[in-house]
Amino acid sequence: MAHTVKKLLIANRGEIALRVVRTAKEMGISTVAVYSEQDRNSRYVDMADEAYLLSGDTYKDTYLNEDLLIDILRKTGSDAVHPGYGFLSEVPSFAQKVEDAGACLLYTSPSPRDSTSS
């Protein structure tokens, strides 16, 4: 089933987040960026339609904090998440939480689903 994305949460940082913001804007999709204190002045943060600070000192507290990202997903009304690469892009529990929140996870193969299940 096709899903039309209207608002995209970008759950990553740096160059990948910038590329996703640019592409989404070209497609007419509203963007939501997340950032840590160290990324506050990054270009992707300025280019996004909305941006939310991830409080914390470690990646575990920020970009790997599944529940915090799902809260932002819900708060912003985003209907899709682009995880970029690394961080949560291959974490089955995050994919399930995104789905449970009524949004879709955009990713490329291989799937972040558990490859051990048949």
Feature-to-residue mapping (PLM):
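Conserved small/polar residues in nucleotide/adenosyl-binding loops
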Residues: Y107-R113
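ATP-binding N-terminal substructure of ATP-dependent carboxylate-amine bond-forming enzymes
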Residues: M1-L106
